[in-house]
Amino acid sequence: MSKNSKAYREAAEKVDRTKLYTPLEAAKLAKETSSKKQDATVEVAIRLGVDPRKADQMVRGTVNLPHGTGKTARVAVFAVGEKAEQAQAAGADIVGSDDLIEKIQGGFLDFDAAIATPDQMAKVGRIARVLGPRGLMPNPKTGTVTPDVAKAVQDIKGGKINFRVDKQANLHFIIGKASFDETKLAENYGAALDEVLRAKPSSSKGRYLKKVTVSTTTGPGIPVDPSVTRNFTEA
């Protein structure tokens, strides 16, 4: 839905810009303002009160959404031998080592998440400049550098998402599809926000959640009350 289209303007008119919606209200309105031509992804954008330039104010983490993302993630795994077999059995879409690295160096990036066993990280480091900017670099803090590759694959396939603050102190994550019931969207939102709150740096001063917006990939942004940090399914 183009922002210049009549349908988008009509959808945007349904959003009261003077109001801060509850998570449940925002989820319901996101569904109503989404394009009916496709099952759009529902996204959350948060402006944080941190300074990402400071190492001790980096916010990142993972969360298993209780109702999944509505999307089956494509997972690449860097592993060899028995670990490679375990990854394949768990449903990994592509598994390899030097061959996979060479493929990525050649431009292959048809996956949504990457996992590596610890012994592969020295090799994976060769493509850090390719994977890092795209949020695909395996990292122990997000559980994607692990000897238990099978569990890591299953977690991601089951709805595990990663979040990381960007250079502008913004953080983005998805909470499902427009076809989801609004209660499920609100519960996914709550699970993710709980982890964002847990990840608050001790050195962060002042208001941590400055601005929260919910939208679909085809609809307008909906302002959410950042003070609502519990009872997410209440209107």
From Swiss-Prot:
| Gene Ontology biological process terms in this record | regulation of translation; translation
Database matches in InterPro entries = Ribosom_uL1_bac-type, Ribosomal_uL1, Ribosomal_uL1-like, Ribosomal_uL1/biogenesis, Ribosomal_uL1_3-a/b-sand, Ribosomal_uL1_CS
Pfam families the UniProt entry points to: Ribosomal_L1 (PF00687)
GO MF entries: rRNA binding; structural constituent of ribosome; tRNA binding
Q: Which UniProt keywords apply?
A: Repressor, Ribonucleoprotein, Ribosomal protein, RNA-binding, rRNA-binding, Translation regulation, tRNA-binding
What domain of life?
Bacteria
Quote the SUPFAM superfamilies the UniProt record gives: Ribosomal protein L1 (SSF56808)
Could you name the Gene Ontology cellular component terms for this entry?
Answer: large ribosomal subunit
Q: Would I find Cytoplasm among this entry's keywords? A: no
Q: Which NCBIfam families match?
A: rplA_bact (TIGR01169)
Which family does the similarity line name? Belongs to the universal ribosomal protein uL1 family.
Q: What does this protein do?
A: Binds directly to 23S rRNA. The L1 stalk is quite mobile in the ribosome, and is involved in E site tRNA release. Protein L1 is also a translational repressor protein, it controls the translation of the L11 operon by binding to its mRNA.
Q: How is the subunit organization of this protein annotated in UniProt?
A: Part of the 50S ribosomal subunit.
Name of the protein: Large ribosomal subunit protein uL1
Q: Which organism is it from?
A: Mycolicibacterium smegmatis (strain ATCC 700084 / mc(2)155) (Mycobacterium smegmatis)
Output the lineage of the source organism: Bacteria, Bacillati, Actinomycetota, Actinomycetes, Mycobacteriales
- Gene label: rplA
